[in-house]
Amino acid sequence: MKKTKEIIIDAFWQLLEEKTFNKITVQNIVERCALNRNTFYYHFQDIPNLAEYTVKLWADEIIQNNYEFGSPMTCLSPLVEEFIKHKKAFQHLYSSSQKDEFITYMNHVALHIVQMFMKQSSHYVSRSEDEKETLTHFYKCLMIGILIDWLECQGDYDLKLFVEKIYHLIDSSSQTLL
């Protein structure tokens, strides 16, 4: 049986798929959950607090569920899959007043995923700490840049295919990055 907080979160994500963040009300959420307003306010201060909590929870789940990657670009796969799966919701979050918090959590997830890859990969053993930090920063920025561009373009191109093309271009043109 789902806990009340999870039910509220699920309703919030459903509503994000349907309408912009700024149009979602506490009333919409409690009606969707068949709860009363007091129950909502017992768990969350307001909708921005709910948004922050749910994005952080989403980020933590991606980090916990994805530890093994074959290449720096395959690190992006879990994020790409989530963005495609919840395209409208992420577009609505990105275009909302919670945009800064959303980008902060995206950065957190991307950095963690790339750091996990760097720790696992034998390609980086001989690199200096400074080189490892530089490469980690590069791949994190590349990941976030691609995701933000996709959101800015309203998701009008095949994100998964684009990431695969980028990976092949980097892989074939510069083995020194690996």
Predicted ranges, named:
Residues 1-19, 23-26, 32-178:
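Alpha-helical bundle regulatory/interaction domains
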